[in-house]
Design a protein with these regions (language model features):
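Extracytosolic ligand-binding ectodomains
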Residues: 1-104
Length: 104
C-alpha cells in the first residue's frame, strides 16, 4: 500500500500546485499545504476523501473477502465487498491524536 499512498499524495499535491500556481507553490509551501487540506481528495487508489488539520488523509475503509474460484465471474473478479466504514469512523478522532500542530 506504500506505492498507492505515494501515488495518492503526489497526485493531490500536483492538483494543489496547479490550483495555487507553480510560482506561488514554490514561494510558499505552507500555502500549498493549506490548499491541499482545503481541497477534497479523489483518486483511483483510495477514492474520495479529505485531509484534516493534522495532515491525516481520511477516506472510507473497505473490508473485502476473496471469492472462491467458482464464484468468480471473469478476470479480476476476485473480491466481494463485505463492509464499508465511513471515513469519520475509520480513523482515530482528531482530538485523540495529540498533534502539536493542531490547536484546540
Amino acid at each position: 500500500m506504500i506505492q498507492a499512498g505515494e501515488y495518492s499524495a503526489v497526485l493531490h499535491y500536483l492538483k494543489a500546485v496547479a490550483d495555487v500556481g507553480v510560482r506561488a507553490a514554490k514561494a510558499s509551501g505552507a500555502e500549498t499545504v493549506a490548499r491541499m487540506k482545503a481541497m477534497p481528495t479523489d483518486d483511483d487508489a483510495f477514492g474520495p476523501g479529505t485531509i484534516r488539520a493534522d495532515g491525516r488523509k481520511l477516506h472510507p475503509a473497505y473490508l473485502f473477502e476473496v471469492k472462491k474460484p467458482e464464484e468468480s465471474r471473469g478476470p479480476f473478479n476476485y473480491y466481494r465487498l463485505l463492509q464499508t466504514t465511513d471515513a469519520a469512523d475509520a480513523f482515530r478522532p482528531l482530538g485523540d491524536g495529540g498533534c502539536p500542530l493542531v490547536r484546540a
